[in-house]
Regions:
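Domain-level signature for respiratory redox metalloenzymes
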Residues: 1-101, 106-343
Length: 343
């Protein structure tokens, strides 16, 4: 809104404001009430019990509860303080207003949570997994219904999206957020400053998004359409394609296949897009779009890499070009992945 009033694009206005100092990065003022998180959703992690690195600090600063911190902070130690972050002698405790945890066991995190959503466990949900430790795709299959009030992870988040979409009407509509994207490895931006990194804030260079600073990207959020978007595949797959690690390829044929497999949205904001009504639909989307489970996509991915290297790499997947692994396939037998340049 401020950018529109100034007659500037969101990116140009953000750059101008950062250079003037009227706008700052949230990381520069971590104790500012507008900058720290208020809500925390925890999924498949005992964050406050074992998997959080330095979880005692989370107990103090995020929850404001009893903790076991024994060391003193830098201010009391007389240590070197950060130069680009505003220092507060007394940091805020208990920054979070809400903690929601999805788990099938009563972990330490559940004990600290405001709301615990009981999720389905093994043999109660359809899902899949793999690992960089082996080359196979494994299924999780629902043999029985989830116990008592528990639901699968997919159904829980789908329900949250549906309720949020209904409640936000009249409060939130289409909003534009300005987000920053760090300079990514395996991308052209990785060579943005090939002769040495300079700091725009110290006046060593100009602030150029994607070169001397993060990418600055305006993103439109259609909040009332959250549920429709959650349960469908968006249009960008057909507009810009799929990819990773600096390469991309066309996905039109895969999107057409998913329209036949999952059917399409008949109306609403996602009209005509492939549906994701169930966990199996979501699994089929992954299996169809991933080069590791779709031979035709693997060939396209290797061809995309060939454009950069000048050598033909498609022979690495040509013998699997006609192989398309479906969810029912891995239910019958775990399947070996196809060679891919992005894995």
């Amino acid at each position: 809104a401020e950018a529109e009033k100034a007659g500037m694009s969101a990116v140009d206005y953000t750059v101008k404001s950062l250079k003037e100092g009227s706008l700052r990065f949230a990381a520069e003022q971590p104790e500012n009430g507008k900058n720290h998180p208020r809500n925390l959703f925890i999924w498949r992690s005992n964050l406050l019990g074992s998997s959080g690195k330095g979880h005692e600090y989370m107990l103090k600063y995020l929850l404001g509860t009893e903790h076991g911190i024994q060391g003193q902070d830098l201010g009391k130690q007389g240590g070197v303080k950060p130069e680009e972050v505003e220092w507060q002698d007394n940091g805020l405790d208990g920054k979070l207003d809400l903690v929601v945890t999805l788990d099938f066991r009563l972990s330490s995190t559940c004990l600290y949570s405001d709301i615990v959503l009981p999720t389905a466990t093994w043999y109660e949900k359809d899902d899949m997994n793999t690992s960089d430790m082996h080359p196979f795709i494994h299924p999780l299959s629902a043999a029985v219904d989830p116990a008592w009030e528990s639901k699968s992870d997919w159904e829980i988040y789908k329900g949250i999206a549906k309720s949020f979409s209904a409640l936000c009407v009249g409060h939130l509509g289409k909003e534009t957020d300005v987000v920053t994207l760090p300079i990514q490895h395996d991308s052209a931006a990785e060579l943005a400053q090939p002769l040495g990194v300079k700091d725009w804030k110290k006046g060593e260079c100009d602030l150029i998004p994607g070169k001397t600073a993060p990418h600055i990207i305006p993103v439109e959020r259609d909040y009332p359409a959250t549920y429709e978007r959650f349960t469908s595949i968006g249009p960008l797959m057909e507009k810009i394609g799929n990819g990773g690690k600096g390469i991309a390829w066309n996905t039109q044929s895969e999107m057409d296949l998913l329209r036949k497999l999952n059917y399409v949205k008949a109306d609403g904001p996602a009209k005509g897009q492939p549906m994701l009504n169930s966990a199996i639909d979501a699994a089929e989307m992954i299996l169809t779009l991933a080069p590791e489970t779709n031979g035709n996509v693997a060939v396209k991915a290797w061809a995309a890499l060939s454009e950069f290297t000048g050598r033909d790499h498609t022979h690495l997947a040509l013998n699997k070009e006609d192989e398309k692994i479906r969810f029912r396939d891995i239910q019958a037998q775990p399947r070996k992945i196809i060679s891919s340049p992005t894995w």
